[in-house]
Amino acid sequence: MTANRHQIATYLTDYALSELVKYVMEDTGCDIEQAMDRVYNSPIMPALQDEENELYVQSPAYIYELMQQ
């Protein structure tokens, strides 16, 4: 993976994570710490961090739907 592609993947993953935390907070009413715990410990997290499967290019809303399954 080129450095530029890695930077893009990192940026998109970080963006998706911040949106996922917001979605969890909105849907559950929990605080940011609890929301981050739910997102970072969810089964979808390893797939989101895997740059080869490119889940990070999907919309945060789609990733959130996957996280809820």
Residue ranges and their predicted role:
Residues 1-69:
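C-terminal alpha-helical interaction appendages
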